[in-house]
């Protein structure tokens, strides 16, 4: 299985794309969030990802740097269906609020022909906290991350039958106590890191309910995570970001540490 980082930035970046990614293997692909606009098409094309071939999509929450790109994804899917270039079912997962918003945007913006395709070929699947679904032939359990800004879900995916090896994504906020059961001992944890610890006062990471590299790494170390991927970061120091984040993070996390750039691919298993 591969992790394809389509974007690695926080909301207001200009030198990279907003955080979103695809999990892919021979069984299929699973796309998580869409970033903030139709730049998702450019990122996908550059990464060799064919969006219309993905059948399962997950939207973590309603913030613009996550949901607006997914509206474009939904438009592409319905356009391809209408043109007859693809057939079959597409599935969009999320909690009740984001599913309602995604459908509302489409109903208010799409032309009737696309809405007809949406009604016939797109399933909007509302998931609850702790609910498990089969995606890519694997068990995926969605969970409420406990955000106080906007309702947000993360997920944990079995990498091997029985759940002994897992990948956990805790959205774009620090992992809280309510989600630790899903991350403890995980083979992979995807966790936001807004900036270096020394730069917190400049970037106001805590004010925006985000972590520093040091804090994310301390959390992963405490939970016995094997590999940690840091994303949803500033781009002011983009050219040096990987080097600087790795230098800070390795002081606090003893496992495999990854600070991907946009379009980077990480082999998970």
What is the predicted role of each segment?
Residues 1-47, 151-172:
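Conserved beta-strand hairpin/beta-sheet module of binuclear metal-dependent hydrolase folds
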Residues 3, 33, 44, 61, ...:
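Divalent metal-coordination and catalytic microenvironments
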Residues 11, 92, 98-99, 233-238:
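Short histidine/acidic/glycine/proline-rich micro-motifs that form metal-
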Residues 13-15, 126-198:
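Active-site-proximal loop/helix segment associated with metal-binding centers of metalloenzymes
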Residues 32-35, 54-61, 65, 69, ...:
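Active-site neighborhood of phospho(di)ester-bond hydrolases with catalytic His/Asp-centered motifs
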Residues 38-90:
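Active-site metal-binding motif and surrounding structural segment of the metallo-beta-lactamase
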Residues 86-151, 160, 258, 262:
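Metallo-beta-lactamase
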Residues 174-263:
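Cap/insert and terminal regions of metallo-dependent hydrolase folds
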